[in-house]
Design a protein with these regions (language model features):
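Charge-rich, low-complexity N-terminal segments
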Residues: 1-45
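A short, solvent-exposed beta-edge/loop patch
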Residues: 86-134
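Short, highly charged C-terminal tails/helix-capping segments
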Residues: 137-149
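A structural signal for short hydrophobic beta-strand segments in well-ordered beta-sheet cores
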Residues: 25, 48, 88-90
Length: 149
């Protein structure tokens, strides 16, 4: 069995820290052995999933968000060519006329011990890149039709 991480953050402390910054942080959810915090920031909600967890600390986290709409594979490929840290994954619409999906992810390996404040810089980077990705999608969206007179 792998040794428990000596570095990282606890889920509870991270939730408290994010809420203290003004994030609308939900209760932790566990799915397939992974714990996730949903942050209902508007207009861009996102998730923080904890990996490589021991009894108290997790030393690997992933920020992620899901976008749906008139998204193209070319938009996602273009983003990935131009941006090193925030990676996007494209899923075409399941049905003709349906909405495509893009998932963006930012992985962070933590080398500090215990304090959620070690997430300061990664969180700032995440929020900047998340906003930039959303702005890129909006800028590429087809122009809205002029309102009927």
């Amino acid at each position: 069995a792998a040794a428990a991480p000596a570095n990282g953050v606890s889920v509870a402390e991270t939730r408290t820290w994010l809420a203290g910054l003004g994030g609308a942080v939900g209760e932790p959810t566990v799915r397939d052995g992974l714990t996730t915090l949903h942050v209902a920031d508007q207009p861009l909600p996102w998730n923080l999933t904890f990996y490589a967890c021991g009894p108290s600390l997790c030393d690997d986290v992933q920020f992620s968000a899901i976008f749906t709409g008139a998204i193209t594979a070319e938009q996602v490929s273009s983003w990935n060519r131009e941006h090193r840290f925030l990676k996007a994954f494209y899923t075409p619409a399941a049905t003709p006329g349906g909405e495509a999906t893009a998932v963006v992810q930012y992985d962070v390996v933590l080398t500090g011990t215990g304090a959620a404040q070690q997430l300061n810089e990664p969180t700032v980077i995440w929020l900047q890149l998340l906003r930039a990705f959303a702005e890129r999608l909006v800028a590429a969206a087809p122009a809205a039709a002029a309102p009927a007179q």
